[in-house]
Amino acid sequence: MLARITPSPLKGTVPAIASKSMAHRLIICAALANGETHVTCNTTCADIEATVRCLTALGARIETVEDGFQVHPTMKSVEFGLLKALAGGTLDCGESGSTLRFMLPVACALGAEATFVGQGRLGARPLSPLSDEIIAAGCDLQGLGGFPLKTSGRMRPGTFILPGNVSSQYISGLLLAAPLLAQPSCVQVTGLIESRPYINLTIQAMKAFGVEVNVERIPARDGQPEVTNFRVSSGSYRTPGSVAVEGDWSNAAFWLCAGAIGTDPITVEGVSLSSAQGDRNVLAALSRFGARIVRSTNAATVQSDKLAGFEMSAHDIPDLVPVISAVASLAQGRTFIRDCARLRIKESDRLATTTRELTALGAQVRIAGDDLIIKGVDAFTGGEVDSHNDHRIAMMAAIAASRATGEVVIHGAEAVNKSYPDFFDHYRLLGGKVTLEEE
């Protein structure tokens, strides 16, 4: 699909969609609980549908209802944490890294004989050292490095050791699986943890289902790195009856950034300022640029002001880098975005694709090691860009187009369906002029 955008100011109010990150976690916990759970979720997307497919393949029954999902669990009961092996089917993860990295340890903890498949770059994205720990715990994984990936054997409880500089999804996946094991287990992380807020979301979701994760941090000393122990007891997830998925800061960030570079304020309603989502820090970043921020209990408003570049780290907010780079492109002076290494293994190599597509629109962006250096310009030009089948690159380009001097054409615009199928509808709601065409 091709999106043809005529530059037009974006302004007004838009509702937040459901947090994709939290929806994954709550639906997984619900499918593993001791009874039915109603999950209120105001939107869905391709990634969430992938998680639902995988849980269904493991025996859960998940009904789509008007306001979300009714989840009938995989297991009706768990006695002393002992589970019978499941004859799992094919688990189709689509292009969702979260689905694969969460469901692989869960399937192995259940003792499922399952076959994982996926699409796009997913098969090439790394699974080690998560896969190493699963194998060490007694499971057999055949086909690592691509698809199909076959699992057999049941994961033994124990201590799972991961470095802190790997995907937080590995840590979250092991945490989600831990209550299914026959005895208490520990996920031990050495060194500074990247994207820690996502682990906090996992702990929050597990707590909603009666599972406590005890966290012990041992500071670095005598030349040894810090160690964080996440200890989880064995036993069943316990349904609270109903849970609600909060609004999504990751996708709200696109509209808030549009407000920062536009001529009029933009408000996103339905986001919690007390959320554990790391991407709520988009407000702090935009404030550092100089944008005007208005916060309320359930909404945030951003309006442009004189923007100036600064130095920031992407350590805990890697998914914000593309759209923050668009803001930086229109800020005076230089912006340095550090700690971007993890962007290379997303749906695209986002260091490369962010640089390439913003440059195609007249920005001055260059890569220096694992950092981005961006020199501000007065406006984006028109031009043609490619999403590289990456939802965040497509949405970044659309936000940049609102401040372009000519028409912007986005190839592969259907990539937004991965996380935000209503993106272009909401773009029009805010006054954007976009037509969608078949390529």
Language-model region placement:
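Short, structured segments at the rim of ligand-binding sites
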Residues: 1-439
